[in-house]
Amino acid sequence: MSDIDQWIETLKNGENLKETDVKILCNKAKDILNNEDNVIRVEAPVTICGDIHGQFYDLMELFKVGGDVPETNYLFLGDFVDRGYNSVETFLLLLALKVRYPDQITLIRGNHESRQITQVYGFYDECLRKYSTLNVWKYCTEVFDYLALAAVVNDNIFCVHGGLSPYIKTIDEIRIINRKQEVPHEGVMCDLMWSDPDEIEGWSQSARGAGFVFGADVVKEFNRRNGISLICRAHQLAMEGFKLMFDNSLVTVWSAPNYCYRCGNVASILELDENLKKYYKLFEAAPTDRAQNSKKVIADYFL
């Protein structure tokens, strides 16, 4: 068995990798991610997943429902870490799968794949607690800078963590951003990870303090101009697992059931077949969530 296969087995068992192995894994992942474009072209069939937020045992449920890699192709929309108790295992397993099966799993960046955010919402503290050093946090946050910003499925479905930006009109404009940096406090890269849709016209400031809020007219014009039929995003809790808006021109997919171990929501994944027919698969939290054994304060859920 190769090192990477051994690491995958170790992580699937909920065990931590050695610090030296984390460094090797993160370096391998950076080499692969470095060769990917800002906007990744993905071919259906593919299964799209929203926020995971360190809920490792629920990620295991997700794979039970959706199928294992490489039999199923996956596109994850970011926010792998923070909030949940097992961000280390969650992120490293997804990275290991990416290294082992680079064409079967696509990872894009969420607003929590950020040094600043992880220092507040759990990942930083978890790394320190599990490894008694910040090295693992540093290795992982270096990988964050290499993650793609968006994906397009079959030139028809635009996938992003948060939403749109008033500073761009076309997907091609995303392709020329310098993404290999900490998430900025403003600008296109920030907006892609922080913005939200709402029942408004045009644009407005976001209560999150980053990104914007955008309405149906913005979505329909963006979709028309770019020749796409749907924006698929995550970033906001959907109590029913997913939420369609604006005459089905935008969908939010949420993949962290019983978010923060208290919200009571179901989760979903969106399966697209080769003809882009959509199947929303719902799932609930893992029956025995060992992650809850460690007690800690969880910040409010709206970031």
UniProtKB/Swiss-Prot annotation:
<keyword id="KW-0378">Hydrolase</keyword>
<keyword id="KW-0464">Manganese</keyword>
<dbReference type="Pfam" id="PF00149">
    <property type="entry name" value="Metallophos"/>
</dbReference>
<keyword id="KW-0904">Protein phosphatase</keyword>
<protein>
    <recommendedName>
        <fullName>Serine/threonine-protein phosphatase PP-X homolog 1</fullName>
        <ecNumber>3.1.3.16</ecNumber>
    </recommendedName>
</protein>
<feature type="active site" description="Proton donor">
    <location>
        <position position="112"/>
    </location>
</feature>
<feature type="binding site">
    <location>
        <position position="53"/>
    </location>
    <ligand>
        <name>Mn(2+) 1</name>
    </ligand>
</feature>
<keyword id="KW-0479">Metal-binding</keyword>
<dbReference type="GO" id="GO:0000724">
    <property type="term" value="P:double-strand break repair via homologous recombination"/>
</dbReference>
<dbReference type="GO" id="GO:0005737">
    <property type="term" value="C:cytoplasm"/>
</dbReference>
<dbReference type="GO" id="GO:0046872">
    <property type="term" value="F:metal ion binding"/>
</dbReference>
<dbReference type="InterPro" id="IPR006186">
    <property type="entry name" value="Ser/Thr-sp_prot-phosphatase"/>
</dbReference>
<feature type="binding site">
    <location>
        <position position="235"/>
    </location>
    <ligand>
        <name>Mn(2+) 2</name>
    </ligand>
</feature>
<feature type="binding site">
    <location>
        <position position="161"/>
    </location>
    <ligand>
        <name>Mn(2+) 2</name>
    </ligand>
</feature>
<dbReference type="GO" id="GO:0004722">
    <property type="term" value="F:protein serine/threonine phosphatase activity"/>
</dbReference>
<dbReference type="InterPro" id="IPR047129">
    <property type="entry name" value="PPA2-like"/>
</dbReference>
<feature type="binding site">
    <location>
        <position position="111"/>
    </location>
    <ligand>
        <name>Mn(2+) 2</name>
    </ligand>
</feature>
<feature type="binding site">
    <location>
        <position position="79"/>
    </location>
    <ligand>
        <name>Mn(2+) 2</name>
    </ligand>
</feature>
<dbReference type="GO" id="GO:0005634">
    <property type="term" value="C:nucleus"/>
</dbReference>
<dbReference type="InterPro" id="IPR029052">
    <property type="entry name" value="Metallo-depent_PP-like"/>
</dbReference>
<comment type="similarity">
    <text>Belongs to the PPP phosphatase family. PP-4 (PP-X) subfamily.</text>
</comment>
<dbReference type="InterPro" id="IPR004843">
    <property type="entry name" value="Calcineurin-like_PHP_ApaH"/>
</dbReference>
<feature type="binding site">
    <location>
        <position position="51"/>
    </location>
    <ligand>
        <name>Mn(2+) 1</name>
    </ligand>
</feature>
<feature type="binding site">
    <location>
        <position position="79"/>
    </location>
    <ligand>
        <name>Mn(2+) 1</name>
    </ligand>
</feature>
